[in-house]
Amino acid sequence: MRMIGRGGAYVPTGDSSVAGTEGFVGNVLTSDPVRYVRNAAIMEQEPSLGLGAPTVAWADAAMRQMNQFAEHSYSASIRQPILMVAAGRDEVVSTPAIETFGQNLLAGRHLILAGSKHEILQEQDQYRAQFWAAFDAFVPGTPRF
């Protein structure tokens, strides 16, 4: 569809409905009910802050990039220091793929937060604390709080 000028169309079964505004139970974003409800209320007030379904062009670009990321030589060629933090209970993206990518980094580190869902910084404090501890250890000169 991208090739015939329909890249801006939503993927099949997708639409502009804002994700993350349905009920808390069964959501794939966070296990923190307070942050989830707060974010849903914000997006209901201002839908332009939310995300709908991906477009065909976005999905095409993502698939191309994932294929490149899957090549061992790609991650092994990265020389910049990278900290990758992934959610252990992520249902949006592949945590095993992130872990494989991270294992091949020469100058990077990866951390899987067991129990965390997709939106790590919108998670319960126990997961956020693990993220910030890893961040503070990774970034030189980060002040301790």
Description of each model-found segment:
Residues P54-Y74:
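Active-site nucleophile elbow and catalytic-triad environment of alpha/beta-hydrolase enzymes
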Residues E91-S94, L121:
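Nucleotide-sugar-dependent glycosyltransferase donor-binding/catalytic pocket residues
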Residues A61-R64, T100, Q130, A134-A137:
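Alpha-helical elements of Rossmann-like donor-binding domains used by nucleotide-donor carbohydrate transfer enzymes
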Residues Q80, S94-Q103:
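Short alpha-helix in the alpha/beta-hydrolase fold that links the catalytic acid
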Residues V34, A53, A57, P96, ...:
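Conserved active-site and cofactor/substrate-binding residues in soluble primary-metabolism enzymes
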Residues I78, M84-A86, D90:
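Short beta-strand/loop motif that positions the catalytic acidic residue
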Residues G108-F145:
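Catalytic active-site module of serine/aspartate enzymes centered on a nucleophile-bearing elbow/loop
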Residues M1-G50:
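Alpha/beta-hydrolase-fold enzymes
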